[in-house]
Amino acid sequence: MKKELTIRFFILYIDSLNLKYQAMKPLKKEDLDQEVFDLYDDYAHSRIERREFVNRLSKFAVGGLTVAAIMGFLMPNYAKTSLFSEADPRLVEETITYDSPKGAGMMKALLVRPKNASGKLPGIVVVHENRGLNPYVEDTARQAALDGFIALAPDALSPMGGYPGTDDEGRTMQGKRDKEEMLQDFIAGFETLKSHEQCTGKVGVVGFCFGGWISNMMAVRVPDLSAAVPFYGSQPTAEETAAIKAPLLLHFAGLDTRVNAGWPDYEEALKANDKTYTAYMYPEVNHGFHNHSTPRYDEAAAKLAWGRTIDFFKEKLT
């Protein structure tokens, strides 16, 4: 009897050590079921409320793993993932304002270019996700500048005071704005960049998530847009697709069933209207794979997609 109790105690002790180890061990995305990332996608796109998100995550809080730990892991960490500083000596950047008469009125945007540039540069409008101009998208604009372009990254939250500092707040704020009005804000940003004294007048657009939809719609609405690169963006209708003049480079995430569901009809419309496009599907990666601030980031796919994007812009804008 005494021996059995000793064995049971030893087993419980080992189990407690395992739980502590699991709690202390750094969480990796490979540790989480794909359903966790799907739930985060639903939450990040306002298809479920925070309470439901937390409740549904609870089934994955096992073996010393807590809901709080999972949520903390899924959320963006800009303090640890920022790629550039505002004082990067290779760049010249400023916050500008421009008028959006068909949109919100006065808009703010980050304007950035390479410091060592000689002469005018082709331009890229960089369009954020559904939560305002956060540090990830600012980093993307800076990277575009280092790659040889003058980049403009507008903030759709400008009429509400700008990006509030957290993505949750930004998403709530952006959800209160009208999509058509925001589209007009980015079209006005295109016109501002096109006429900038340091721009050649050849301008393309790249956008992510909501920004992918904006990129698709700018291709529909802006006849003199030189190129459009939507990353996992919702698609225009077949009727709207007929108006596209700009060449398209489209990036899709293999696990992104929500956005990918609209791709077959979009591709059919592109083919039917003899549009110029190239599309890439990146297998086994999630929506948001280019965003380096969250665990959905996939380094290999992100670098490949961005390299293709820059090559495309250099071909179409220069």
PLM regions: where:
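N-terminal cap/lid segment of alpha/beta-hydrolase-fold proteins
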Residues: 81-118
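Short beta-strand/loop motif that positions the catalytic acidic residue
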Residues: 250-252
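N-terminal secretory signal peptides
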Residues: 5, 9-52
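Alpha/beta-hydrolase fold nucleophile elbow
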Residues: 197-208
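Short beta-strand element of the alpha/beta-hydrolase
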Residues: 120-129
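Alpha/beta-hydrolase active-site loop
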Residues: 173-196
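N-terminal export signals
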Residues: 50-76
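Cap/lid segment of the alpha/beta-hydrolase catalytic domain
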Residues: 131, 157-180, 288-293
